[in-house]
Amino acid sequence: MQPFNVIVISNPVLKAEISPIALNQPQITESSHLLVFASWDKMDNERMEEMYQYIYSQRSLPFDKNMDVMQNLRNLFATFTDEQQYHHSAKQAHIGFGMAIAAAAELGVDATPMEGFDKEALDELLDLPAHGLKSVTLLALGRRDEKTDWLYRLKKVRLPMDRFVISLG
């Protein structure tokens, strides 16, 4: 199941409109591409069935091959509130978000992950509710300007491994 979408924004005018919604962080307007990870607002039967039909058609399998799996998911999500369904979808979007950051690093593209933005205002600007979506995270992509980026020459600081990782043996 892939209960989220990625919206790619390269239009400078639209990025300028997003900037105040995202605390005027310069990466919004300076990026070549801004990705918005937006999760489904709820996990309804229609969306799940459409996704499963697509998966099975791509695998050349009959749709009824694993109906028990789909029914189990329907039963599970039927017990969730709309808010719980959204939170599940948002967690799935975060997994994709992490993969996008790793892919950008592999390609040598600078990436700035962001959660500091007004989600409701961004959703309204991009008309996400009309698509059954809610914004989760932003990922600004591009190449940093080594001359003007004050962080470029500073050491990247992360917790030492022995403080970050808890080993249980």
Language-model features: locations:
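A glycine-rich helix N-cap at a beta->alpha junction
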Residues: 27-32, 36-40, 128-148
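Short proline/glycine-enriched turn/loop segments at secondary-structure junctions
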Residues: 124-130, 153
